Design a protein with these regions (language model features):
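TM-loop-TM module centered on a large, flexible mid-protein loop between adjacent transmembrane helices
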Residues: 97-98, 104, 136-140, 256-321, ...
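A generic transmembrane alpha-helix motif of multi-pass inner-membrane proteins
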Residues: 51, 388-393, 419-487
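Helix-loop-helix junctions that connect adjacent transmembrane segments
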Residues: 20-24, 65, 141-147, 175-307
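C-terminal membrane-solvent junction of multi-pass transporters and transport-like membrane proteins
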Residues: 210, 342-346, 394-443
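Membrane-helix boundary/coupling elements in multi-pass transport proteins
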Residues: 91, 114-129, 232-239, 300-340, ...
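Membrane-interface loop-to-helix entry segments
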Residues: 29, 148-196, 250-259, 392-395, ...
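Membrane-interface "cap" regions at the ends of multi-pass membrane proteins
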Residues: 1-62, 76, 201-207, 473-487
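Hydrophobic transmembrane alpha-helices that form the core helical bundles
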Residues: 51, 76-156, 161, 314, ...
Length: 487
């Protein structure tokens, strides 16, 4: 039974005294399109090839399927309150819009700039990774050695073209890529199980007792990293056909779909390598472990196909986060946190094209800075920034859970039940709070350099403070703009 809201959805759009958009974005995205973009943001093939070995090696445990089961359970509980808020906050800002609705303008403004900083870090990390991966793929197939940054520039250009246009085009591209990715991984999973794996098909990696071995907190932490991107569903609210139904369904599909896919594939991979051998294999050859399974259980051609698809997987992830950042810039431009020109919809493409172009320019400029600084694209840029971004996303989820509790706690006229407004958000707040504590405690495992680790933590904190300062300045000097921040 669908429960109708007993009060009007919060309009988090621009205040009438601020510049407004000159066109509306088309509402042409259904459950499948939005879920595809969120699933692609999680980069399933990239996670299986690149993240799975890291989960195993840092945790020193073969219990990787259990890590993903736990992460899925926590995120599923979080999704209950997250999607409930989507019915009442008519805004494309997702995390920050919900935080603002529950915790106020100042905290919400801080969350907005914090989210932008987090996703910019993700974009930079992935852009550096795909450049190196492309260069490596070319040499693997007999081509010449080429600079990674040239390929990164090319991928950014493609992203800029797709992101500039109607988002339905991006959704179609991501949908095709995602289907192929999942199909390839499923083929390998089935081949491993059909051929009996390394030591026979067993459920030994599903033994709960393994959670007491090694460093399970690190395994859970990196499992969460593999889910980053699922939250993209709510960002596309303004382009969904029926957001009150589409957003919740797409979010649950993304979380449960990714979780089951990861858990099953993780189990199959432990069967393929062997429960007793997989920690050593992941530690000794993290980049080649899964590709080696494709060679052993399927064919050399499949191994080559996976190397190519790794590029499309990471690109799909980049395109998703580009679209997420674009919607953040668009919403923040409409509110006056960023220049108002970013809050304008293109009359030609019916998309926030100016915001999209700005995201591309910011990414390009920061990557030039990376080149000038002489940072290693994988060991430093990818590793450091992906680690910091993981922490940032989980912090946003903690604040969102708290905001859900406060938002519905203030409204006695909302009859949505204890589970969706209090119990589930409370459980999510507690469990995600523990995860944040574990991430900070083990941050040195993500960023080995203590100095760099502290710098990244300070940068994250600074991005939050920027938004807080903007809100305080608005309150003191521009009351109309401050009121426009109200969710």
């Amino acid at each position: 039974m669908t429960i109708k809201p007993s009060f009007e959805p919060v309009d988090a759009g621009p205040h009438t005294s601020l510049p407004v958009t000159n066109a509306a974005m088309d509402r042409n995205l259904g459950v499948g399109s939005i879920a595809f973009m969120a699933l692609a943001g999680a980069a399933p093939l990239g996670a299986v090839i690149a993240a799975f070995p890291i989960v195993i090696s840092v945790s020193q445990s073969p219990a990787i399927p259990l890590f993903f089961v736990l992460a899925t359970a926590i995120l599923a509980v979080f999704t209950v309150g997250f999607t409930r808020m989507a019915r009442y906050v008519a805004n494309a800002g997702a995390f920050y819009s919900y935080i603002q609705a529950g915790l106020g303008r100042i905290t919400g403004s801080g969350a907005a700039t914090f989210a932008v900083g987090t996703y910019v870090m993700l974009m930079l990390a992935l852009a550096a990774y795909i450049g190196v991966a492309t260069s490596d793929a070319i040499t693997h197939f007999g081509g010449p050695a080429t600079p990674w940054f040239l390929w990164t520039a090319g991928w950014i250009l493609i992203t800029a073209v797709l992101g500039y246009r109607d988002i339905e085009l991006s959704a179609k591209v991501l949908g095709i890529v995602l289907v192929v990715e999942i199909l390839v991984v499923v083929i390998i999973d089935v081949a491993i199980l059909a051929r009996g794996g390394a030591e026979g098909v067993t459920a030994s990696s599903l033994n709960p007792g393994l959670l007491t071995e090694g460093f399970p907190s690190l395994g859970l932490m990196f499992a969460f990293f593999s889910f980053v991107g699922f939250e993209a569903t709510a960002v596309f609210r303004n382009e969904a056909r029926d957001p009150e139904r589409t957003i919740p369904r797409a979010t649950y599909l993304a979380v449960v779909g990714v979780g089951l896919f990861y858990a099953f594939s993780a189990w199959a991979i432990t069967v393929g390598v062997g429960t007793d051998k997989i920690v050593g294999a992941a530690t000794d050859d993290p980049t080649g472990m899964v590709l080696g399974l494709a060679l052993t259980f399927v064919s050399p051609v499949m191994q080559d196909v996976m190397q190519v698809l790794l590029l499309s997987s990471v690109f799909a992830c980049i395109l998703t986060f580009h679209n997420v950042l674009t919607r953040y810039f668009f919403t923040m431009g409409g509110k006056g946190i960023l220049p108002a020109a970013l809050g304008v919809v293109s009359t030609k493409h019916r998309a926030p094209s100016r915001a999209s172009l700005t995201v591309s320019l910011v990414t390009g400029v920061l990557l030039i800075g990376v080149l000038l600084a002489g940072l290693d694209p994988i060991a430093e840029v990818y590793t450091w920034l992906s680690g910091a971004a993981t922490l940032g996303v989980i912090v946003l989820m903690v604040l969102t859970s708290l905001a859900v509790l406060v938002f519905f706690g203030k409204r006695s006229d909302v009859s949505l039940g204890m589970w969706s407004t209090k119990i589930a958000p409370g459980l999510a707040l507690a469990s995600l709070g523990v995860v944040v504590w574990l991430v900070i405690k083990n941050f040195s495992a993500l960023v080995p350099s203590p100095v760099v680790a502290n710098v990244l933590l300070v940068v994250l904190a600074a991005t939050f403070l920027v938004g807080v300062v903007v809100a305080l300045v608005f309150r003191a000097t521009r009351p109309d703009a401050y009121l426009a921040l109200d969710a």
